[in-house]
């Protein structure tokens, strides 16, 4: 599977063996009001555990986790 990964530049990369999920994790930091949420993209073997202040979405098809504010190619 291929997933988009951060940091910038955001690129689509092949995940390591056993990592068959893509994820998009978002949360607010001290600059959330001016910059918006922090966004982390990557690969995972299982959907990461969510802390109370985070949102996470997992998916299992190639490049299914595009940056929410960036247009898909």
UniProtKB/Swiss-Prot annotation:
Query: Per UniProt, what is one Pfam family of this protein?
Result: Toxin_cobra-type
Which keywords does this Swiss-Prot/TrEMBL entry list?
A: Acetylcholine receptor inhibiting toxin, Disulfide bond, Ion channel impairing toxin, Neurotoxin, Postsynaptic neurotoxin, Secreted, Toxin
* One term of GO molecular function: toxin activity
Cysteines joined through disulfide linkages:
3-22, 15-43, 28-32, 47-58, 59-64
Tissue specificity is: Expressed by the venom gland.
Is GTP-binding set as a keyword in this record?
no
| GO cellular component terms, A-Z | extracellular region
InterPro entries (alphabetical): Snake_3FTx, Snake_toxin-like_sf, Snake_toxin_con_site, Toxin_cobra-type
Q: What is its main location?
A: secreted
Family to which this protein belongs: Belongs to the three-finger toxin family. Long-chain subfamily. Type II alpha-neurotoxin sub-subfamily.
**Annotated function:** Binds with high affinity to muscular (tested on Torpedo marmorata AChR, Kd=0.38 nM) and neuronal (tested on chimeric alpha-7/CHRNA7, Kd=12 nM) nicotinic acetylcholine receptor (nAChR) and inhibits acetylcholine from binding to the receptor, thereby impairing neuromuscular and neuronal transmission. The toxin also shows a very weak inhibition of GABA(A) receptors composed of alpha-1-beta-3-gamma-2 (GABRA1-GABRB3-GABRG2) subunits.
Record's protein name? Alpha-elapitoxin-Nno2a
